Amino acid sequence: MNNAAGTNGAGAEVAPLIELRDVVFSYAGHTVVDGVSLQVDRGELVALLGPNGCGKTTIMRLINGLELADAGAYLFDGHVINATFLKDSVASQRFHQRVGFVFQNADAQLFCATVGEEVAFGPAQMGLSTDELKCRVRDAMELFQVSDLVDASPYQLSGGQKKRVALAAVVSMNPDILVLDEPTNGLDEDSCDIVVSFLLAYVAAGKTVLMSTHHQDLVRRLGARAIYIDRYHHVVEASVPSYGTESAAAE
């Protein structure tokens, strides 16, 4: 993708990596996202919090291009992401390589016969050398401790194992931003520790993370910037200990 105007040159303002401007999205006649605006800069770790039905998952899907806004605008790295943009096969492929999305339910994204094939599928589409592909797959599987499952069927794994495989499959593509819908749901304490350590290292390396969660302790542990979305779709920057009693009642 070409650089957006105004983002190059000494002293030039750099566009946010993610920007939603008054985004509206409806499903089956019901407004799910109503005028939401937010920004995520490069190198940030941002957590979306809020009650069920506030639109967190839909926002994630909009950012990944799985849904398109009915009104408003979504910009990624200064580029408007809309139907016209996504019809450009080259631009669309590059966009989806740069934005890694992990579903809350890992079953929604696992489709290969073995774990090894699952983790290799994404980077295999990137024109990498055989050695680079093998290295990416090996490193991602080791990172999320699923190397011993290389020949296993993803469908026979536990929920926590599936989540770690899904993370490895996305991380193997080395995206610029990880968009994670409830990344620690269904994970035991050890698996949570693996994910937390990875996310901290990922952001320290200059990458970006946007995640949804209901767990305040996870947000505090990660030192994430918290964005709270209430049931009326109001977006509020908030400190984790006081972002609203409404969220405490969620899930």
Located regions from the model:
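H-loop/switch region of ABC-family ATPase nucleotide-binding domains
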Residues: 213-214
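Conserved ABC transporter NBD signature motif
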Residues: 72-84, 95
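Catalytic Walker B motif of ABC-type/P-loop ATPase nucleotide-binding domains
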Residues: 178-181
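The feature captures the beta-strand-to-loop junction immediately N-terminal to the Walker
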Residues: 49-51
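Conserved ABC ATPase "signature" region
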Residues: 131-149
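Helix-to-loop junction immediately C-terminal to a conserved catalytic motif
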Residues: 64
